[in-house]
């Protein structure tokens, strides 16, 4: 099935605008890829799951379009466990060995981990070089590749070391979703559902109606979901690129979810720990339950969200073995907190997310205890 090309410009105050392009076959478009390299050096950063499928093709496309390019490659182990300061150091070393100058470009070929790591390396090398995001997972296409957040994890918490570094471009080749494992597809759908939950009730309803097509990987349904999700994120990011206010709404479920990920030691291919999308799914349900407990919303909306996530084969309960006290301790390190007080994204029902400062820890503990 041939999908229409979709593009969306993100215009940020005081920052170079960039375009999100969504279509099949984009990784073979060497002229488009190489057109974003201002100098002669490019680093292609990918992971052990994605590189065997696409890295050689991207390298060939770049060199066919620009034979003068010096293209370095770095392949990291797949999974959140690679998003570390050590792996970040490997990316910096790769740039140094390439002889990359300030007009170099880093290409992030992979999912959210690769995008975060490559973006952070680009932000730091010589105080900032270009980064082009080439997302290959649904989660990266609809969330992490858009907006310029880059980071690595440390044992104390997720994404605590990072920078805002908007990409030069986001080029999402939807053909890459054909090789995406079903679990990773579902993880991406959790972030898609988030957009309906925070600001688009009609999209929430559409997702319910199209759930079977989306789970089956129907190309047309996925293209529509990706485009709608990117529209929502781009609109918010353009108004609040540095997350001083409204952009925090995009974190519905993330404070709870990040606590789960950190306490489990982060997910990795082949283990039973929740991946990012799964943890966010659980986190959204917890946020909805807390909202109802605080009198902000009703139980009917909470159940509608839980049911939709369940229908997409996503978890909705805290995994066994995680204590409320341990999760709360992780939540205290969340970047949205102010003056040591919990600041959470909650909601007043489907499509009506809200930033709530100074949430009482006792109320959170009660929700975490179930």
UniProtKB/Swiss-Prot annotation:
Zn(2+) binds at residues 191, 254, 276. GO terms for molecular function: 3-dehydroquinate synthase activity; metal ion binding; nucleotide binding. Its EC number is 4.2.3.4. It comes from the Bacteria. Pathway: Metabolic intermediate biosynthesis; chorismate biosynthesis; chorismate from D-erythrose 4-phosphate and phosphoenolpyruvate: step 2/7. It catalyses: 7-phospho-2-dehydro-3-deoxy-D-arabino-heptonate = 3-dehydroquinate + phosphate. Catalyzes the conversion of 3-deoxy-D-arabino-heptulosonate 7-phosphate (DAHP) to dehydroquinate (DHQ). Belongs to the sugar phosphate cyclases superfamily. Dehydroquinate synthase family. NCBIfam families: aroB. This is 3-dehydroquinate synthase. The lineage of its organism: Bacteria, Pseudomonadati, Pseudomonadota, Gammaproteobacteria, Lysobacterales.
